[in-house]
């Protein structure tokens, strides 16, 4: 009987120990599950951060691409503006050369007109002198008549030359007037071109500033991309570490569940044995 009591006490003690171990294993299992859930939450948060980092990286790359496209467009606009400035400078040079040629033709015509006027005045003076003189010498009269004829011829020639010069002068004046109109138009165009040149210069300065800012933004984007890439690598490393931790915790959970099953089986076996013992005692 004492042996049975001792056996029952031992079995009860073993049962209590088994229950304690089962409770401990259940608590450990709960803690392991909690750690696994926490780790899974960290993994989800890490994956979310990774997705956010990837989105930020894509956005930064798109902004960098847009900045490069805008910079290329500004460089093309700058080249077009430089071509327009060069063409305008060539047109100004041609207008200045045309004006110089017109001024030279005007000076030549003015000189020829002065010479013709001087010859006409001289002929008129000689004619008046010959008319006012009364010569008795026939030979001198003939000579004077010849001189008069020659003077008249010279006068007529001078008149003809004068008319020709006047006609040429009129043509030159017309050319000069057109040249002046072109010059005025050219001056207006020069003013417009200077204004356009000033605007182009301002645009060039703006483009230079924009290019400098674009370069600064490009460097900033590169730094951001580098930082984001480092963050992405760190996030991937944390995710990989978390995944390994989850696998390790899962193995620990599986092991604890196996131990819990074994302890439950032991507890059931002890309970069955106690029930059988109680039945045997009741039979006595």
Curated annotation (Swiss-Prot):
<comment type="similarity">
    <text>Belongs to the tropomyosin family.</text>
</comment>
<dbReference type="Pfam" id="PF00261">
    <property type="entry name" value="Tropomyosin"/>
</dbReference>
<dbReference type="GO" id="GO:0042803">
    <property type="term" value="F:protein homodimerization activity"/>
</dbReference>
<feature type="compositionally biased region" description="Basic and acidic residues">
    <location>
        <begin position="12"/>
        <end position="45"/>
    </location>
</feature>
<keyword id="KW-0677">Repeat</keyword>
<keyword id="KW-0175">Coiled coil</keyword>
<comment type="subunit">
    <text>Homodimer.</text>
</comment>
<feature type="coiled-coil region">
    <location>
        <begin position="1"/>
        <end position="273"/>
    </location>
</feature>
<keyword id="KW-0020">Allergen</keyword>
<keyword id="KW-0514">Muscle protein</keyword>
<dbReference type="GO" id="GO:0006937">
    <property type="term" value="P:regulation of muscle contraction"/>
</dbReference>
<feature type="region of interest" description="Disordered">
    <location>
        <begin position="1"/>
        <end position="54"/>
    </location>
</feature>
<dbReference type="InterPro" id="IPR000533">
    <property type="entry name" value="Tropomyosin"/>
</dbReference>
<comment type="function">
    <text>Tropomyosin, in association with the troponin complex, plays a central role in the calcium dependent regulation of muscle contraction.</text>
</comment>
<protein>
    <recommendedName>
        <fullName>Tropomyosin</fullName>
    </recommendedName>
</protein>
